[in-house]
């Protein structure tokens, strides 16, 4: 079964020699999948394994999906330049991960996306935006 999801990468854990086990947060909930070969030097999908990668992920497989393709929607890597912004965004990702079973994922996904964009693109204090997301 092939499907594509629009998701934000929450976490990537090393698996085998060059693979990552990733947790993707989408409007449908959390999806755990494998990104193959992205730890190699010339990997084409390396961008899709970065924290806060906002992409359309192409998945193949039912029980344990494998990411076969990804196209980036927006680049949130600029948040890494500011420690406070980065920390606030990572806290929001962790909160979204832990609360995904108890909340409406579609609403939570959109709220997370709005909060990350607020932190990156506006002059609002990152701590205030993160606190508002967590409420």
Segments from the language model and where they lie:
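Non-catalytic alpha-helical scaffolds and adjoining flexible linkers that form interface surfaces
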Residues: 1-21, 25-135
């Amino acid at each position: 079964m092939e499907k594509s999801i629009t998701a934000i990468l929450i976490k990537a854990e090393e698996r085998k020699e060059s693979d990552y086990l990733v947790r993707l947060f989408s409007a449908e909930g959390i999806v755990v999948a494998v990104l193959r070969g992205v730890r190699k030097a010339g990997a084409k999908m390396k961008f899709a394994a970065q924290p806060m990668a906002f992409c359309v992920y192409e998945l193949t497989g039912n029980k344990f999906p494998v990411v076969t393709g990804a196209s980036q929607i927006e680049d949130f890597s600029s948040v890494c330049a500011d420690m406070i912004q980065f920390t606030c965004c990572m806290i929001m990702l962790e909160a979204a991960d832990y609360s995904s079973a108890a909340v409406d994922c579609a609403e939570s996904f959109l709220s997370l996306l709005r909060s990350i964009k607020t932190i990156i693109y506006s002059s609002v204090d990152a701590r205030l935006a993160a606190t508002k997301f967590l409420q």
